[in-house]
Amino acid sequence: MGDMKTPDFDDLLAAFDIPDIDAKEAIQSAPDEVEGHQGAGGASLIKSGDASVGESSALRSPSPSTDSQSDPSIVSVIVKNRVRPEPFDGGENSVPDPLNHNGFVSSGGSVHMSQSRGQPNGEQWPVCSSKAIPETAGQHGSSGGSKQGSNIFNKLKPLMAQGAGDSVGRARKMQLLQQQHMQQEMNLEGADKAKAPANPSGASGAASPFFPPPKPLLSTPSTASSSSPSSSSPSVGSRVSGAVASSPLATSLTEPFNGTPRLSSSAFRRADSEEEDSDPDSGGSLVIHESPDSPTPPKLSRRLRSSPENSQSPSIPPSTSISPNAYPKPGDVPSASPASPRAQQNWLSTAAQTGNGKSLPQEERNPEHVIEERDSPESPEPEMPKSSMPTSAVTKRSCSPAAASSPSAALREPKEEDEEMEVDKASTENGQDAENTDGGKGDTDKIEVDPAQSLEAETGSSTNSDGKAATGGKAPSRPLKVRIKTIKTSTGGITRTVTRVAGKGGAAANAGKDANKGQTGGRAGPVKGGKKNDTTAGQGVKCSTLPVSTLEASSAMLAAASKVQNKMTMQSDKTKVSATAVSITKATTLPVAPAVGGISVRPTVGKTTNGGTMPCKPASIVNSTGAVISRSQSSLVEAFNKILNSKNLLPSYRPDLSTPPPPEWGLPMPAAGYRCLECGDSFALERSLARHYDRRSLRIEVTCNHCAKRLAFFNKCSLLLHAREHKERGLVMQCSHLVMRPVTVEQMIGQQDTTPIGMLSPSLSSPPLTSSTTPAGTIPAPSTSSPLKDSPSPGTASTQPSPARRGPQSPQALMPLPCKKGEALQYHNFKCPECQAQFLSKAELVTHFQQIRATPNSTCTLCSPPMMLPNWCSVSAHQRIHKHRAPHVCPECGGTARQATFQTHLEESCLHFARRIGYRCSSCQVVFGGLNSIKSHIQTAHCEVFHKCPNCPMAFKSAQSAQGHITSQHPALTAAQAKMIYKCVMCDTVFTQKPLLYMHFDTHLAKQKVHVFKCPDCTKLYAQKGSMMEHIKTAHRGLSVKAETPPTTSSPVSAPAGNSTSKPKPATENNSDELSQGPGEEEEEGEDEEGEQEGEEREDEEEEENEEEEQVSSPESGNMEWRCKECKKRFPEREDYIDHMKNEHGTVGNEEISLQIVRAFIQFSQQSSSACPNNTRGRQESLPLPVSRTLLNCKSGLKINKGSWHCSEGKRTFSSRLILEKHIRVRHGIRSRQTTDRTNAPNTRKRSLPADGAGSSSELDNESGAPPAGGGTDTDDVPGEDTSGPAKRTRASENRPVEQEEEDGTFRCTPCGFTTQDWEEFQRHIPVHCDAENAPQQCLQCGACFASAGSLSRHKFITHRLRQGQHDRNASPGASPQYGSPSSPKAGEDGDGGVSCRVCGRRFDKASDLNTHFRTHGMAFITAHRTDKPL
C-alpha cells in the first residue's frame, strides 16, 4: 500500500467543510486551551521550523531541558483507520506517512521529531531492544495523553483482541491494576516514584514471555530515541521536552500535508507487504481515547493482535518522532500512570514522563506488525451516527473512574472491529480537529471513507481511551511531542498508537473523574459493539440518545450504555429519532455542532479540572458560525444532486400479486402492492416497504434547516421521503453541511433483523407525520417520521419493536340504524347462523359479517346494480334473500328477522342494498363507482400514447417527432401518417386500437374491485360504509337537519323542498367524501331510485308508517310548521301545537287541526331548479292554502315535471296529492272533514281537482243534477274507497273538501296535469287524451280514460260521487245546483230557475254564471261554510 497516494490536506479540508487553518495559528493557540496541542484545522500545533525535517530529525536527541518531574499531558491514540499514506518523497521505498491521516505521526517513524532515540539513561537503544522502547514510549505517551483533556482523541477504540494467550478477562484485570496504579500516582511524589519501576518493565518488554523477541524492522540506529519519550526515565523526559519544543505534534501533523519530507523505511514497507493481504478490514473509524476527566486514565495505549514475527509496540509517544530502526514492536504496550492534579494544570508541558507509566505484564502484550495504514472497504462501521457514537463510548468510560479507563475494549478480539468514537466536548476539540481531519478518515465508524476524517476534526473533542492512555507524572511544561505508531494485526486490523507529550501550559485538561463525567453529560457517544451488531448510543445529558442501529457489544459496555441511555432519556425533552433520518445533533444549551464525519458534539459548558473550569470551544468546526466553506463543497453538492436525480438503472420492482394470499392469513394486500413514491418500487407487504426505506446504501448526513437538527439518511428514498413530508406542509426542504459516505457490506446486510419481525412499530398505527408515543427509555420517532420509515433504534431494539406491517384490523362494527317500525332481530346466543362460529357479543357478530375476507363468487350479479359482499357468511345470507328462504339472516349484522319485517330491516336499518362495486385505480388509488369511468380515467390519465412509424418499429411520444422521423428516414412515404398505439400502464402491453385497450382493462380491473356504498337517498358514493351511515344520519335523518327535501337537490341538507320534484336524484357533486362516478352511472342510479320511489308510493301503509316514524320532523320553513291562527305562533311538532291550543286557547277543533295539517304537511316541490310562474296562459292561480301548484312546464305549459308532494312530518315524497292525503289521514290520524260536516256536503262542498299524480282523478265540480237528499249519506258509504289503481284513489273524496274549497273552481286534467278554471276550455282539452281503441270511455270531470263503461261508472261514483246517469243529466258544471253553486237551495226557491250566491246574495240566471262568480270569494265561503255563519 506504499504506492497509495495520500490526498492533499487542502482537498481533505475541502471535502469535509473544514476551514483551512494555518499551522502557525494552531501553534499560537493559548496553552491553557485544551486543544492547544493540536491545530484547529488539522494543522500542526508548532511551527514547522521547530522540528527538523528528514533523517536528521530522527537522530536529534531529546531536549536536555526536559524535567523529569514535569507532568506532560500525553495522549495515547489508537486509530483503526483507513488511511492511504503517501510514499516518502526521498526514499525509493514507499513508507507510511510520518503523519497519519488523523493528524498523528505515522508509524513510519519520521525523524523530524526532535527527540533522541537514546534510552532514558541517555544511551542508544539497541536494535534488538526496540520492543522495550515502544513500551516505555507508550507508557510515557499514554500518561501524557490521559492528562490532555483537550485532546480530541480522548477516546480509544479497541479494534483488536490481545494475543491468543491473553484473554479478555485477563486484560480487564490488568486494566483494573493499571487504574489502581494510576490512582496511586495522582500525587506528585507517587508519580516520581512510579517512574523508576516503569523503566525496567518497559525495557524488559522484549524479554517478556508473552511476546516473542522483537524483530528489528528499522535500520536507523536511533531506534531508542524515537521511543524515549514514552520511556519512564527522567532523562528521557528532559530530552523529550527539548525535542517537543523543536518538533511538536503539530509539526508532525502538518508535515504529511505540507509536503515535509517523510522518512522511508524498508521495515515499514516490508511489514506492510507482509500483512497487506491479511488485513482485509482496516479500522473504519478513528478510535481516540483520552482520560482528561478521569483521575485514573487507562494505562494501555493499544494492543492489537498481529503475527508474532512482525511485532512492534502498539503505542509510541505521539510527541516523539519514530525512526525506522527505533520503531517498537507491537507487543510492547506502554502503561501510563494516572496524572496528578498538578499535571493536569501543566497539560501543555511536554516533559517526558519517565517513571509514571507502569509496565504492563508481558502476557498482556501482543506482538504486532508495524504496517502502513491502508484503506479497506471491508472494515466494519458501527451503524449509528457519529454523534451518537461518542455518547455511548463516553458512557462506557465515564460510568465509573475505573470503567472510564477500563481496557476491556482494547482487549477485545480482533473481530470486534467496530470502532468507537468518544467525542469529548472539551475545549480541545479545535486542536483535535487538525489530527482528526487527517485521522478522521479512518475514524468513521460506519463508513470507511476519507470523509470520516472530518468526523474527528469537527468533533474536535478529546476522548478517553479504554485504559490505553494514562496521564503521566508531573513534569515541567515542554513543547508538545508526538510519537505515532501504526500497527497491523494478524487479523487484518490496523492500530495506530499515538503518544503525545503536551507542551508547557496549564494542567492537563479533563484529567479528573469529574471532567470525564462532564464529557458523558455533554457529548453523545456510541456504544461499542460487535462487528455487525450495533449497540445503542447513549446521548449526553439533556441529549436524546441517537443510535442509528444496534451493535453487539460486550456486557460491560452495554451496561454502561444502558445506564447513560436511561439517564439521557429521563432528562431529555426530545427523544425522537427517525428510522431513516436519525437526528445526529440536538442542541442542549449550546448550538448543535454537526460533524462532517458524522459525529456532532456539543461543547460542554466547562470542564472541571482541580476544581476549576476550563473554557469550552465549539465541538465541531461546522458548528462555528464563521466556518469557511470548502471549495470542494460545490463538487460534493453536484455529486449529491447526481445521486438524487440519477435514473435508476434497474427497472421498478413489482411483485407478482396475481395469486392473493390465503384468507386465513389475514393479509390485506392492495392490488398494486405497497408502492414507494420515490423510486416506484412496489412490495407485497407493508413491512417490505418499511424495510425498503430502511435499507442502507450510503450514508447521507445533512442538517435540515426546518427540523433544526442533524439527520442521517441511508438511502435516497428515505431522504426524499423526508423532503416530501416538508413539501406536504408547503415547505421546500433546505439542508446544509452535507456529508456523504459509503457504508460497509456489514452494514448493508443483516442489521434489520436484530429485533423480532412480528413486533409492530408503535408509530405505524399513527397517521403519517405524527409522532408515536413510546415508553421511557425508548426512542420515539420524530413527528416528521413517516410510518413506513420507522426503524428500530440501536440499543432500543429490545424495547422498541421494529417496523412491521400492521396486522389486518377488524372493521369497526357498524350497528344497524334505529328503525321504529322494524322489529328487533334475533341473535341466537351471538352465534353465526352461517358458519356456526360463536361470539361473545352482538358487536363481534356484526363485525364477523362485515369483515372483508377473500371469498370466491363474492359478487352478486342477480342484484341490479350488482354488489360485492364482504365474506362467505354474508354471501350465503344474501343468496337466500333471492330464494326467499328461511332463515332470513341479515347479511350485514347477522341477525335473524321475520319475513314481514326483513325487507324493511335490509333497506332502512342495515342499508344492505347500498352496496356497490367500485374500482380503484392502481396508479393513483382513486376509487371510481363505474367501470366505464375508471377505464376512461386510466386511458386518459395514465396510459401512454405513442405514434408509431408505419414502416419501422420506431415509436414516438409526439406526432411531430414521428412525422419528422418519417420525413427523414422514409422519404418515400409521403402521405403516410403515424399510427397511434396505446400502452397499458398496468402491464406495458401495447394495443393499436383504443377499444382493444378498454377490453384489455377488464383483465386488470377484475382484480381491482373494491367495496363502495351508495347513499340510498342521494347519489353520493363512499368507500367506507361507516362514512355513508354518518352521512345518512347527519344529512338525511339527523335531528339538526331541516325538513329534508327529496334527495334530488344538489345538497340534500340545504335544498328547499319547494324546489325539487319527485325524482330522487340530486345534482352531481364532487365532494371530498364522494367517490368518482360517471355521468351514465349517475343517470342509471337516478332511474333506479326513481323506480324505487314509485314502488314506495304503492307500498302498503306499514312502510309509509315506517318512513314517518323513522324520520324526525324538523320543519324547514314556515309552511311546514304548525302555526296557531290565534296568536300566530309556530311550532315544529304537531304535539307542541296541540298542547299549545289546549293550554292557551282551551280548544282544538278537528276542523282547525285539519286545516293546519294540510298547511303543515302538504307542500309541493319541483325538481327543476327554477320554479315556473303561477300563471300560465293567462290563468292566475290564487290558492288560499300554502300549497304551491306550479306544476306546469315553463315551456309548454301542458306537461308537468313529475311534481312531488312532501309530508313534512314523515319526510315522505309522493307523486300524487291523493296519496299524500291518504298518508296524512292514515298515518297521522287526521281527516280533513268530519262526518258531521259531510251531511252538508251536497249544499256546501264543491269538488276540486286532485293534485298531480299519474292516474289520479280530478276533483271537478259535479255538474250533474243534485242527488237525492240522501246523497250526503251515500258519500259517506261509498264502497271501494280502498281500491287502488291509476284512476282509483282510495277515499279521495273525503280528503278533498278542504282542497276543493281552497281550489274552488279549478279543473285539472289527470293524464297531463293541465289545470284551468274554465269548464269549457277544460272540456275542449281532455279529448286529446282519449284513446278510441284502447280506452274509449273518458271521464268528463277529470279526463281519465277507461276501457269499459263499468270502470268509468265506478270511477265516477268513487271519485266524483256521481251515480249512474248523473253525469249525463248534468253536462256542465253549473247545471247542478247541489254541486254547482252554494245557493242551490235558494235556486229552487226562486222558481224562475235563477240562482243566488249565498256569500254576497247576488242572483244569477245561470248556474254557470253563479259558479264563475263564486270563485271570486275563495276562503270567505270556506270560512262561512265551516262555521255555518251567514255572510
Swiss-Prot record:
Zinc finger C2H2-type: from-to: 674-692, 830-853, 919-942, 947-970, 982-1004, 1013-1036, 1122-1145, 1205-1227, 1307-1329, 1337-1360, 1395-1425
Record's subcellular location: Nucleus
SMART domains: ZnF_C2H2
Compositionally biased region (Low complexity): 61-73, 174-188, 196-209, 217-248, 311-324, 385-410, 760-775, 1043-1057
Tissue-specificity statement: Widely expressed with highest levels in eye, spleen and ovary.
InterPro entries recorded: Zn532-like, Znf-C2H2_11, Znf_C2H2_sf, Znf_C2H2_type
GO cellular component: nucleus
Biased composition (Acidic residues): 1080-1111
Bias (Basic and acidic residues): 361-377, 438-449
PROSITE patterns registered for this protein in UniProt: ZINC_FINGER_C2H2_1, ZINC_FINGER_C2H2_2
Protein name per the record: Zinc finger protein 687b
Organism per entry: Danio rerio (Zebrafish)
